[in-house]
Structure formats: structure tokens, C-alpha cells
A protein has these predicted regions:
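Peptidoglycan cell-wall recognition and remodeling modules
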Residues: 93-186
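Secretory targeting and sorting signals
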Residues: 1-29
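Intrinsically disordered, low-complexity
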Residues: 19-109, 180-186
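Generic intrinsically disordered, low-complexity segments enriched for polar/acidic and small residues
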Residues: 8, 43, 50, 63, ...
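Short, flexible coil/linker segments at or flanking structured domains
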Residues: 3, 7-9, 17, 34, ...
Length: 186
């Protein structure tokens, strides 16, 4: 009778020790997993921002092999995160300076409503600081129109890049005949 009781006691002790060890390593494993997921989220966010700015500027996407998805090395994940953060910052900086920025700002000066600026919406069928109609927005800024609504909801950079697409398509500054003339552009 003693023998089964001793065996049961030893088994219970071993089980308690095993559970104690498991609970001691569990928080570290959970923290490591949470840190990895946070890094992956940050990488994904910076990559999406980079690609969004590149798409706005009609530039090709920076390619990726998604190697971070297969890695558990936190140093490598931090490196990839910092790489994409740098790319996002550079793409954002580039997007703030469209090739004809000075010209778009001149057109904006005459097209905008004084109290509304880039968010101009006067009810005349034209939207934003460059007064784009729906057809123009659909043709040159369809993705923005779907995602954000009319041009009065777009940032100044987004409006200028959409205008830049029209310019590059061969239309030049002619969609704004009066203001472009006032600016000496046509």
C-alpha cells in the first residue's frame, strides 16, 4: 500500500515541478511572440505607407520577398522595420514635392475658395483646391475618389499629384485655362 502511495506522491511532485517550469517560461514566450507580432505589424504598416505614396506618384512599388514573415530573429525584424520606415519617410518626402509644385500652387491661389483652401467645395460641381470635376477625378485619381471621396477630402499633395497625372497625359495646364493663363503657364 505504501508503494502506490509513494509513487502517486512522486508523480504529483513531478507534475507540479513541470507546471512550475512551464508557467515560468510562458510569460517570456508570450512576450517574445507579442514583440514579434508588433514588429510584423509595424513592417506591414510602413510598407503599406511606402506603397501608397509610390502609387500616388505613379512610381513602381518597392519589391519585397516578405522574408520577415518567416523569421523569428528580433534583430532582423527590427532591421526590416527600420528599412521600411526609412523608405516610407523618403517616399512621403518625395510626394510632398511634385514636379510642378510651384505651378500647382499658383493655380490653387486662383481656384480655391478663400475660406476653404484645399478643402474647397462650393457646390459648383468642382472640388478641392484645384477645382477638379468628378470626371477629372475619376480619370486621374480614381483610387483616391473611391477611398477618400471627392478631391476636397484629399491632401494638397494628393491633389497636386492627380493634377500632375493629367499634365503628364498630355493635357498640360489646359484643364485650368483661365487660372493657368493668369499664372503665365499657357
Amino acid at each position: 500500500m505504501r508503494n502506490p502511495f509513494v509513487r502517486l506522491l512522486v508523480l504529483a511532485g513531478a507534475l507540479l515541478i513541470a507546471l512550475g517550469v512551464a508557467t515560468q517560461t510562458s510569460p517570456h514566450a508570450a512576450t517574445s511572440s507579442a514583440a514579434r507580432l508588433a514588429q510584423l505589424d509595424a513592417i506591414s504598416d510602413y510598407r503599406a505607407k511606402t506603397w501608397r505614396w509610390q502609387a500616388l506618384m505613379s512610381k513602381p512599388r518597392t519589391p519585397t520577398l516578405y522574408t520577415e514573415r518567416r523569421s523569428k530573429d528580433t534583430t532582423y525584424l527590427r532591421w526590416v522595420r527600420d528599412l521600411w520606415r526609412g523608405r516610407a519617410v523618403r517616399a512621403h518626402r518625395l510626394a510632398q514635392h511634385p514636379p510642378h509644385r510651384r505651378e500647382w500652387l499658383c493655380i490653387h491661389r486662383y481656384e480655391r475658395h478663400p475660406g476653404q483652401g484645399w478643402a474647397t467645395r462650393t457646390g459648383n460641381g468642382y472640388y478641392g483646391g484645384l477645382q477638379m470635376d468628378i470626371s477629372f477625378q475619376r480619370t486621374y485619381g480614381g483610387e483616391l475618389l473611391r477611398r477618400k471621396g471627392t478631391a476636397n477630402r484629399w491632401t494638397a499633395a494628393e491633389q497636386m499629384w492627380v493634377a500632375e497625372r493629367a499634365f503628364r497625359s498630355g493635357r498640360g495646364f489646359y484643364p485650368w485655362p483661365n487660372t493657368a493663363r493668369s499664372c503665365g503657364l499657357i
